[in-house]
Regions:
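C-terminal and inter-domain tail/linker signature
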Residues: 2-158
C-alpha cells in the first residue's frame, strides 16, 4: 500500500489560533493505513476526541472511542492514498467548523469531495463531530451503473 497521508500543513490555523483546531489538523495529518490497528491510532484519537465522542457523517453514526477507532481502521484499510486540505476554520467558545477537501484513491476508485466538519468540544476534546458532504459525489457517482444513473438524474434536474 502507498502512504496515505494528508499533505496540508497540520499547523495551518490561519483562520484561527485555537489550539484545538491545530490538534484536529495534526490528527488528520497523522492518520494513515500504517497507523490503523496500532496503539498509535488510539493515542492520536485520544488526544483529540472525548471518550464519549458522537461521530456522524452521511453514511455512519458512531458513539464512543472504541467504535471510532474501528471506524478509522476500516476507513484506512482499503485506501492507497488520502489527502485532506483544510481551507478555513471558525471557532466560538466550544463549537467550531472546518472546511476541507478530501481526495483519496481506492483500488477501484479515485475520488474526492468538499465538506465541512462541525465540532463541539468538552474539556478541550471533541465530543461531537459531524461531517457534512455529498456522499454521492464521494462514492456512488464513481460506481459504473449507479454513477451513470446519478449523472442522468442530475442532468434532468438541472
Amino acid at each position: 500500500m502507498d502512504n496515505a497521508r494528508t499533505t496540508s500543513d497540520p499547523a495551518n490555523t490561519e483562520q484561527t489560533n485555537d489550539p484545538r483546531i491545530g490538534a484536529f489538523y495534526k490528527l488528520y495529518h497523522t492518520l494513515s493505513p500504517e497507523t490503523a490497528g496500532t496503539e498509535k491510532l488510539r493515542r492520536c484519537l485520544e488526544q483529540v476526541y472525548h471518550p464519549d465522542i458522537a461521530f456522524s457523517d452521511p453514511m455512519h453514526r458512531i458513539t464512543g472511542m472504541d467504535a471510532l477507532e474501528k471506524y478509522f481502521e476500516g476507513l484506512y484499510e482499503n485506501i492507497t492514498y488520502i489527502d485532506f486540505q483544510f481551507h478555513n476554520a471558525w471557532v466560538e467558545s466550544d463549537t467550531g467548523s472546518v472546511h476541507w477537501t478530501m481526495r483519496y484513491r481506492h483500488p477501484r476508485l479515485k475520488a474526492g469531495t468538499d465538506g465541512v466538519t462541525l465540532l463541539r468540544w468538552e474539556n478541550n476534546l471533541v465530543v461531537q463531530h459531524q461531517d457534512i458532504f455529498d456522499a454521492g459525489s464521494l462514492l456512488y457517482e464513481h460506481l459504473p451503473v449507479i454513477g451513470w444513473l446519478i449523472h442522468k438524474l442530475k442532468e434532468r434536474m438541472a
